[in-house]
Structure formats: C-alpha cells, structure tokens
Amino acid sequence: MLSLRQSIRFFKPATRTLCSSRYLLQQKPVVKTAQNLAEVNGPETLIGPGAKEGTVPTDLDQETGLARLELLGKLEGIDVFDTKPLDSSRKGTMKDPIIIESYDDYRYVGCTGSPAGSHTIMWLKPTVNEVARCWECGSVYKLNPVGVPNDDHHH
C-alpha cells in the first residue's frame, strides 16, 4: 500500500503551457478613466489615473468611485446627487402631490412642513407604487421614476 501512495503523490496532471484560452483569461481589459460625465460607463471608469511620477496628485488624479462621479459633475456644473431642497411653498395633497424624482424605485424625503421649518423633520419613503404622507402636516409626496427601467435580467 505504501508504494501506491507514493505513486499517487508523484502523479501530476498534464498542463498545457501554451494555451490561447489561458492567455485570454489572464489579459486584463483596457478601461479608459472617465474625464467627464459623458465618459462614465460603469464603476471601472470611475478610478482616477493617479499622479505622474514626481508630481503632487490633484483631486481629479486620485478620486475614485462616487467621489469622482460627484467631482466630474461639479466640474460640469451638475449636481449628480440632486441635493437641492424640496418645494415647501405649498402642501402636497392627494390630488396634487409634490413630485419627487428618483433613479431608484424609492427615495427618502425629509418633510419640514409648509412653510419650511414648521415642524421637525419627518422622514418619509415614497415608492413607485405608493405616495408618502407626512404624519405631522399631511403633505403628500409622489415619486416620479426617471431612471432606466429594470429588465429583471439576472446573470
């Protein structure tokens, strides 16, 4: 039995040293770093190129991810996270709600009443299917989806 163990231990499966599929799998795809919002095409394009040797990096050189997306937007004068305050000049009603735009199927909204600051912030969550009504002042918020429709395609 000892000789059988030793022969199994020395058995090595044959490997192909030159294989085109192995070469293709080891190749890294070339990804261009986005220099403006129009060039953003997924998270891999939101990685900064880094500073050239011997120079001090700028924010544009080293920002990555959402911080880079926000910086590219600010350079073009676009608020990518839509942080402007909601319309508080009126109360939303069921017939005429305050419209909230969102790229997702829900959004968190902080209601402070009408006029603004009438009550403490009440956090609401309007969805695509339901409006949200403030418990304090009764103002109604409705979601307007502006994003790409979900095709429910799973990999």
Swiss-Prot record:
Gene name?
COX4
Q: Does the keyword Oxidoreductase apply?
A: yes
Which GO biological process annotations does it have? Answer: mitochondrial cytochrome c oxidase assembly; mitochondrial electron transport, cytochrome c to oxygen; proton transmembrane transport
Q: What is the membrane topology here?
A: Peripheral membrane protein
The entry lists its GO molecular-function terms as: oxidoreductase activity; zinc ion binding
Chief place of localization: mitochondrion
Annotated protein name in UniProt: Cytochrome c oxidase subunit 4, mitochondrial
Q: In which pathway does it act?
A: Energy metabolism; oxidative phosphorylation
Pfam families in UniProt? COX5B
Q: What species is this protein from? A: Saccharomyces cerevisiae (strain ATCC 204508 / S288c)
Q: Which UniProt keywords apply?
A: Membrane, Metal-binding, Mitochondrion, Mitochondrion inner membrane, Oxidoreductase, Phosphoprotein, Transit peptide, Zinc
* Range of residues in the leader sequence: none
Q: Which residues bind Zn(2+)?
A: C111, H119, C134, C137
Q: Which InterPro entries does its entry note?
A: Cyt_c_oxidase_su5b, Cyt_c_oxidase_su5b_sf
Q: What else is known?
A: Present with 9410 molecules/cell in log phase SD medium.
Transit peptide span, please give it. 1-25
Q: Which residues form a coiled coil?
A: none
According to the entry, what is the taxonomic lineage of the organism? Eukaryota, Fungi, Dikarya, Ascomycota, Saccharomycotina
